[in-house]
């Protein structure tokens, strides 16, 4: 149902842009940072009943956005990572984080120019992780697997299993102010952005975990500031420059053999199959030079025992640069090199946790191990563009990407190196929009 609504809004905006006589367009990519006010009311009430101080009423936002403007109509996509404040209770660290993805539809109150004022509405889904953990005293993987419990971990829309597990219905209404600053000698411009508005989790029963509603962690008034790169059409011949966003699905030809051996040795079931990913790819071009950003999320999950589940998750972010080798009509071939960041997290959770407040009083149920480091990759791609309008305002791009990921570190989980799992050949199929 949500996907149908997204597609309806997408093609509705296409038809509006197509109907206008003298189209102008621009594409922008940006990063933002800000704060959102939020009160975990039900959880804080439980703390108050126990004579404890409440959690602070705000969380931080770090966001990535892509936006395309056609005349006065705006279409975009945003990805947010939100981190709540940390609190200490009896040696346990209590905190939460959420991830959201939004499709934005908006309207500009200003003519195309350096200054823009846009009103927009967003529809999307999310993920929530709420945890209460103490330091894990077990220094080895075997020691952790023999006694993993050092707190509790609650998840809704668990993308540690894969991005397809995003859940819930989230909305946002806001305003965007931006101003373009020239880059000497370049047609691209720096865009300085501010955003303010309100995030909503509209359904009361959503984000209910262990008899407490955490929906306020997905809502609240926000103020964000940021900057990015914009490509206004009056600065460019679009055969020389473009900026497109792609939804990608990938297969990674690797398995966690080292971890599986340790799991079996300690009485757990191994992970089955290979990880796949669902992610976003930004790919821009300026006079034959390519640049871009990749975000994707690998997940494996399954039953560990009769009373526990486990996940193996890795989020990867790459900055890419390269060259376009060949272009003829709608077909193109290019190569990219990427340098990025990756984490690796193994989580073991009990399936029979009690509800609050009993869970708060006896929290030792779950545990996790994590590692992080740098990654590199070479990549080749072939793409084909399909014009979507008679005026050739933008094209749908179908691409096939292939490459090899190289871990620049050991990625140790409890002293066991996982670099052999992180190193892998991969294939990705992407579908995108490019002006």
Which sequence ranges carry the predicted segments?
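Extracellular loop and loop/strand-boundary signature of outer-membrane beta-barrel proteins
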Residues: 47-52, 87-94, 157-164, 206-215, ...
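Gram-negative (and chloroplast) outer-membrane scaffold detector with strong preference
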Residues: 71-154, 165-171, 287-359, 366-381
